[in-house]
Amino acid sequence: PRDLARRLEAGEELHILDVRAPARLAAGVVSPVPAERFHNIPGSELVAMADPADAGLTNDGDVIVVCGRGNDSLRVAAWLTVAGYRAKSLAGGINAWMHMSLPRPLPTPDGFDHLIQFDRPGKGALGYLLVSGGEAMAVDVSMYPEPWLQEAKRVGARITAVADTHVHADYISGGPDLAASLEVPWYLHPADMVYPYDGTPGALPFTPIAAGEEIRLGRGAI
């Protein structure tokens, strides 16, 4: 999935062939892809065609075949290869795409050694890792925190704090579990630990942080 994300970001003209049933697309699709290069044809219908061109596929670029978990797409990609197309299966399918985080370095603020962004194109979400003096804060972590842990290890830092900038409407935060596993604080604004409709307080332990307060991290302050 990371390789595909980088190729799309670079503007490569790829065809995305999603072989799931149309109703499954609501769970997520590979994007951003121009409409004319996104094809949704169930695999059983596609392999019944005499010519893949009947499905609107052209041979002017790689065809990336997508299914739920990367099994059906392997068979379709093999069938397309025999038919003369440059076809590849997306490893892990849309499930892997939705969970993938793509790390990239950003300009580093004063007092910090690294600022790493985690782009999650499947969710349209971003996370971060701030590093200073061997200490790191993981921000807006997904339920799959391995990329944050890997990047911290790569730059020789230890995650000493976890934070969420807000309660996320489109995914479940991995912040509480990561903080608990590392035995470090999980920072959150107190207003985000209250159910907005009836004021019921949340049950997760957290460290409150509000505007005007700061968190010390190595040589820096957030």
Mark where each language-model region is.
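Cysteine-dependent PTP/DSP-like catalytic domain, specifically the C-terminal lobe
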Residues: 89-107
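Structural motif
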Residues: 15, 62-64, 135-137, 158-161
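Catalytic cysteine-centered active loop of the rhodanese-like fold, especially the PTP/DSP P-loop
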Residues: 41-43, 49-95
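Short, structured coil segments at secondary-structure junctions
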Residues: 33-37, 83-85, 181-182, 202-204
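Active-site HxH/HxHxD metal-binding segment of metal-dependent hydrolases
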Residues: 123-124, 144-221
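Conserved beta-strand hairpin/beta-sheet module of binuclear metal-dependent hydrolase folds
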Residues: 107-155
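Positively charged, proline/Ser/Thr-rich regional signature most characteristic
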Residues: 1-62, 143
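Active-site flanking residues adjacent to catalytic metal/cofactor-binding acidic residues
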Residues: 17, 139, 165
